[in-house]
UniProtKB/Swiss-Prot annotation:
Main location: membrane
Listed result of changing C125Y: In s294; reduced activity. Absence of muscle pioneer cells and reduced population of superficial slow fibers
Region (Disordered) location: 645-687
The organism of origin for this protein: Danio rerio
Bilayer topology term: Multi-pass membrane protein
GN (gene name): smo
Name of the protein this chain belongs to: Protein smoothened
Biased composition range(s): Basic residues: 647-658
Length: 822
């Protein structure tokens, strides 16, 4: 028993020793498969030499010997020290400088003891790759500093240099500034961002551009404000399409000008274009900054896009309105709401898309935030593409509108009054000038942007070279070498930027010129008189149709007092809007209006029976009165004759005068032609009419009327009555008989009967009475006479046989008369 116990103890000891040795070997193999347990994989055998420099990049070294075996580009310590000074140019990249200092010292001045030098670890090498990407991009890493060399940079090794504390921190050389905001870092230079002031322009150029913007922005602001104020001062007459579209266009440019001029408020420019770390705002909106940049962008961009889309609506409205000249058709009726929907929604969608992609950038030269200062493809897609589309569509409608006006002026000269023709000429001239300016400004804008697009890459390359040159200045200071002169070789032209801004501000000024007319002066004159409570002496432009409508609306008052005068408010008076040449028709009222016409408008309306009460009939006694529902169907409400028809009527009338004999003798000798004589009107209290060749009978007719008055009035013969009551449709040919019988006679007053009823007169009692004088019907029995109505005499073909009190006759007479106000 005792002999077996020592043997078991010895066996256990040997098993423990074997297990420990196996674990150590396995650990060595796992950590470094290419090494053995007997080799130190974190060190490399070499010859050590005494350090000549006790510091590395400003930090003291805790050892006394080193080796140059790791720095393949240096054969002596002097060369190694010089190379370190050249690498010190990375001091201008703070985040790179913080991680590359230990690596450089571990390679150029490593610790060497007992013939072995310490190797830098793989982790120390990899830590420099991302922060120092500018080295890889500009010059590339040398072979002895590439992390792919596993023998040079083994894993898991501790280095004496890593324990050093470097007391020098990185800095950003102008035009870069130090920042911890990653979004502000300049490409490949982590820790530095571009300064707020654009480095491509000098301070003097900044001041020059700011003064330029202040001048033209103020001019645009004042011009557009004057236009808006002019529209608002006479809004009742100005709020008409298409002219009111210019109000919205000027409103857009007015708001945009406010966005441009906001930078001149105290401290506003730095708040708009600069971040809190004094770097330029790029890629807005961001969660760490204020919304001042975004607000200015929305004001400028949204108003600009809305203004150019309103321009398309303006040209379309011009085109459709010009096509409808001379007609009562309102082409824009019901479409204006769509104008607003399209014009305000499309810029909103574009604005939201830009903000969603964070493509709002600031520019210290212009002092605003806009899209595409950094990535020009966004400016091309969100600015140039919409403006180009607008240019094509708006130009098409503008050209068509001018062609329409030219066609009206050339093909229909007889339709135009002298004033309308003058306005068409003026409008075509102004449209031509406006179109030329609009196309010119847009083409200038395109040219300036193309200039930016084609030269952007060269400007960026020049700026990058300038940044590297500034880094070399730091190296020159460290190595006591000549300091290079750094300058940006290729810079954008300030003149091109001014031209681009002029095209934008010039467009706003051009839009405001539409109110630079004489009508605007009159508007402000009336406004001033209205403010001070004084009435102006300007002749009022009152449309005759409005005057007649006013008299008709006051018919009850005028019936009681026929001598009452009408008063017209400013709402009835039709002043010319501020946009002269846009809102006009071919028959608009003239300023020179006869005062006598205006004073007698009530009598003229009364003459047409407009103010007669409903229970008064103009039918003489013995004529059946039609029911009100039938009577209303036959009144002719309006009579509108085109200029061509008026010319044809005058020519036809002239030919009749040449063929038809004149004078009383000729009429008596020609039984086929008889003139109608005027009898006293049955309408009570109708005003007497002035002498008129088309309305009042001649003197010889008046004398004949006095002689035969008793014979001509059917009401004086009560024996002429129908023997049996007849239905109204059978008695009145205008409703029954004539409704189904075609007649060449025009519609007359429904309260009179027509000559065409003679076929149904067998229902009336016959009489042997015959009228005397020239109105005696030769060879006609009394039974064939139209009894119970005013005598109507057969006339020559083509002449109307209706009463003189007919609305149609009166209207035709005045429309066909050259001296008539109608």
């Amino acid at each position: 028993m005792s002999s077996k116990r020592p043997c078991s103890i010895v066996g256990s000891f040997w098993m423990l020793w074997i297990w420990t040795a196996t674990s150590m070997v396995a650990r060595a193999v796992i950590l470094h498969p290419n090494e053995t347990i007997f080799n130190d994989f974190c060190k490399k055998s070499t010859t050590c030499e005494v350090l000549k420099y006790n510091t590395c990049l400003g930090s003291p070294l805790p050892y006394t010997h080193t080796s140059l075996i790791l720095a393949e580009d240096s054969e002596t310590q002097e060369e190694a020290f010089e190379k370190l000074a050249m690498w010190s140019g990375l001091r201008n990249a703070p985040r790179c400088w913080a991680v590359i200092q230990p690596l450089l010292c571990a390679v150029y001045m490593p610790k060497c003891e007992n013939g072995k030098v310490e190797l830098p670890s793989q982790h120390l090498c990899q830590a420099t790759r991302n922060p120092c990407s500018i080295v890889e991009r500009e010059r590339g890493w040398p072979n002895f500093l590439k992390c792919e060399n596993k023998e040079q940079f083994p894993k898991g090794c501790q280095n004496e240099v890593q324990k050093l504390k470097f007391n020098t921190s990185g800095q950003c050389e102008a035009p870069l500034v130090k920042t911890d905001i990653q979004a502000s870092w300049y490409k490949d230079v982590e820790g530095c961002g571009i300064q707020c002031d654009n480095p491509l322009f000098t301070e003097d150029e900044h001041s020059d551009m700011h003064s330029y913007i202040a001048v033209f922005g103020t001019i645009t602001l004042l011009c557009t404000f004057f236009t808006l104020a002019t529209f608002l001062a006479d809004w009742k007459n100005s709020n008409r399409y298409p002219a009111v579209i210019l109000f919205y266009v000027n409103a857009c440019f007015f708001i945009g000008s406010i966005g441009w001029l906001a930078q001149f408020m105290d401290g506003a420019r730095n708040e708009i274009v600069c971040k809190s770390d004094n770097t330029m705002r790029l890629g807005e909106p961001s969660s760490t900054e204020t919304l001042s940049c975004v607000i200015i962008f929305v004001i400028v961009y949204y108003s600009l896009m809305s203004g150019v889309i309103w321009f398309v609506m303006l040209t379309y409205a011009w085109h459709t309105s010009f096509k409808a000249l001379g007609t009562t058709h309102q082409p824009l009726s019901g479409k204006t709401s769509y104008f607003h929907l399209v014009t305000w929604s499309i810029p909103f969608i574009l604005t939201v898309a830009i903000l969603a992609n964070s493509q709002v950038d600031a520019d210290s030269v212009s002092g605003i935030c806009f899209v595409g200062y950094r990535y020009y493809e966004y400016r091309a897609g969100f600015v140039l593409a919409p403006i180009g589309f607008v240019l094509v569509i708006g130009g098409y409608f503008l050209i068509r509108g001018v062609m329409t006006l030219f066609s009206i002026k050339s093909n229909h000269p007889g339709l135009l009054s002298e004033k309308a023709a003058s306005k068409i000429n003026e409008t075509m001239l102004r449209l031509g000038i406006f179109g030329f300016l609009a196309f010119g400004f847009v083409l200038i804008t395109f040219g300036c942007h193309f200039y930016d697009f084609f030269n952007q890459a060269e400007w960026e390359r020049s700026f990058r070279e300038y940044v590297l040159c500034e880094a070399n200045v730091t190296i020159a200071h460290q190595t006591n070498k000549p300091i290079p002169e750094c300058a940006i070789k290729n810079r954008p032209s300030l003149l091109v930027g001014k031209i681009n801004l002029f095209s934008m501000f010039g467009t706003g000024i051009a839009m405001s010129t539409w109110v630079w007319t004489k009508a605007t002066i009159l508007i402000w004159k009336r406004t001033w008189f209205r403010i001070i409570g004084r009435s102006d002496d300007e002749p009022k432009r009152i449309k005759k149709s409005k005057m007649i409508a006013k008299a008709f609306s006051k018919r009850k008052e005028l019936q009681k007092d026929p001598e009452k005068e009408l008063s017209f408010s400013m709402h009835t008076v039709s002043h010319e809007g501020p946009v002269a040449g846009i809102n006009f028709d071919l028959n608009e009222p003239s300023i020179e209006m006869s005062s006598a016409w205006a004073q007698h408008v009530t009598k003229m309306v009364a003459r047409r029976g407009a103010i007669l009460p409903q229970d008064i009939s103009v039918t003489p006694t013995g004529t059946p009165i039609p029911p009100p529902e039938e009577r209303n169907k036959l009144w002719m409400v309006e009579a509108e004759i085109s200029p061509e028809m008026m010319k044809r009527k005058k020519k036809k009338k002239k030919r009749r005068k040449e063929v038809r004999p004149a004078g009383p003798a000729a009429d008596e000798g020609n039984p086929a032609y008889h003139r109608r004589e005027f009898g006293p009107s049955a309408v009570p209290r109708l005003p007497k009419l002035p002498g008129h060749r088309s309305l009042v009978a001649n003197l010889w007719e008046q004398q004949r009327q006095q002689q035969e008055e008793q014979d001509m009035l059917p009401g004086a013969f009560p024996e002429f009555r129908p023997s049996c009551p007849l239905p109204y449709q059978d008695r009145y040919g205008g409703l029954g008989y004539l409704r189904n019988k075609p007649s060449s006679l025009p519609l007359a007053n429904p309260l009179t009967l027509r000559d065409s009823m003679q076929g149904d007169l067998s229902h009336f009692q016959q009489s042997s009475w015959q009228p005397k004088g020239v109105f005696r019907h030769l060879g006609q029995e009394a039974s064939m006479m139209d009894v119970g109505r005013t005598a109507v005499v057969p006339r020559a073909d083509g002449r109307r046989g209706v009463q003189i009190h007919s609305r149609t006759n009166l209207m035709d007479a005045e429309l066909l008369d050259a001296d008539s106000d109608f």
